[in-house]
């Protein structure tokens, strides 16, 4: 009922329609802390004085965009934790856990929220399909139960990444070329690194070897299913974003792993009430 009321207010409000679309920017990032990615994108000296100065430069650029909400790649069940991190940071207390401090949610999202005097900090919108035991326990309906069983059975067919690359030479080449470039970016400033990562070529390559590449050789005869599962995950992420938007929001920032950016942009670019803004234009001072 709450979402229905919101949609009515947002998409039927004549004042909103006259005032223009909501701007939304997707900032693709390397996962600074722990992540399940095949290759970690960490920068080992992130907490050094020089790197922290570079982080502040990025935050200062994002401040100029003035997002009303900041969305981050963690699941909604972790929202209370990050609310606590934000409250502590407002009082000058950094996270005790290294994995939390060494994380783009804190380093960019929380720091940006503080600069903007946001009341709630960041909003968690990630979606991860739960495993069989958890998924069947928390299922709200038959569809949830069926999706849990479907995901479980599909994952049993998923090859290792090494096997995936062995069977898909074009994906392997795209991945190797990307990693070669990526390693060279580690010598750049954080801003330069993000500008490279969010370039059109980088985002499209990430989309290819993370999502659509599964279909090239119909991996294990389930190529389309692996690709569809990635689209489903991103659709759930977008649903979480849309469900968190209020009629008063004018600008939104999504800080998320680079592999998600292309599909999320594609899903929103035809939406009549949203305007996708290039994150690199923001980093380049609009």
Language model features with spans:
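A cross-kingdom marker for long, charged
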Residues: 221-286
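Bacterial Sec-dependent N-terminal signal peptides
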Residues: 1-22
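Short catalytic/ligand-binding loop motif for oxyanion handling, primarily in non-cytosolic enzymes
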Residues: 33-36, 78-83, 130-135, 261-264
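Short, well-ordered beta-to-alpha junction loops that form the rim of enzyme active sites
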Residues: 72-77, 125-128, 182, 256-258
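N-terminal post-signal-peptidase region of extra-cytosolic proteins
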Residues: 49-59
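Proline-aspartate-enriched helix->loop->beta-strand connector
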Residues: 66-72
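Hydrophobic, often amphipathic alpha-helical segments used for membrane interaction and targeting
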Residues: 82-85, 92-243
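Acidic/histidine-rich helix-loop elements
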Residues: 31-51
């Amino acid at each position: 009922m709450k979402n229905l009321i919101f949609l009515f207010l947002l998409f039927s409000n004549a004042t909103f329609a006259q005032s223009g679309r909501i701007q939304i920017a997707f900032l693709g990032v390397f996962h600074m802390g722990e992540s399940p990615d095949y290759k970690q994108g960490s920068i080992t000296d992130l907490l050094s004085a020089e790197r922290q100065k570079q982080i502040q430069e990025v935050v200062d650029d994002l401040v100029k965009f003035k997002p009303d909400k900041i969305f981050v790649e963690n699941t909604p069940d972790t929202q209370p934790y990050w609310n606590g991190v934000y409250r502590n940071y407002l009082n000058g207390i950094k996270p005790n856990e290294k994995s939390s401090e060494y994380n783009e949610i804190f380093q960019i999202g929380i720091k940006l929220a503080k600069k903007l005097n946001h009341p709630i900090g960041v909003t968690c919108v990630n979606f991860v399909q739960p495993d069989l035991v958890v998924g069947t326990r928390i299922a709200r309906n038959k569809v949830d139960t069926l999706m849990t069983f479907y995901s479980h059975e599909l994952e049993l067919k998923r090859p290792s990444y090494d096997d995936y690359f062995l069977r898909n030479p074009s994906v392997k080449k795209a991945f190797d070329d990307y990693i070669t470039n990526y390693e060279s970016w580690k010598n750049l400033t954080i801003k330069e690194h993000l500008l490279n990562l969010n370039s059109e070529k980088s985002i499209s390559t990430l989309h290819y070897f993370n999502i659509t590449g599964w279909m090239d050789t119909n991996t294990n005869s389930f190529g389309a299913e692996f690709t569809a599962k990635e689209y489903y995950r991103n659709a759930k992420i977008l649903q979480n974003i849309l469900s968190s938007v209020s009629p008063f929001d004018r600008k939104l920032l999504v800080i998320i792993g680079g592999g998600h950016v292309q599909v999320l942009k594609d899903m929103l670019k035809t939406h009549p009430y949203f305007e996708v803004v290039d994150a690199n234009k923001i980093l380049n001072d609009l």
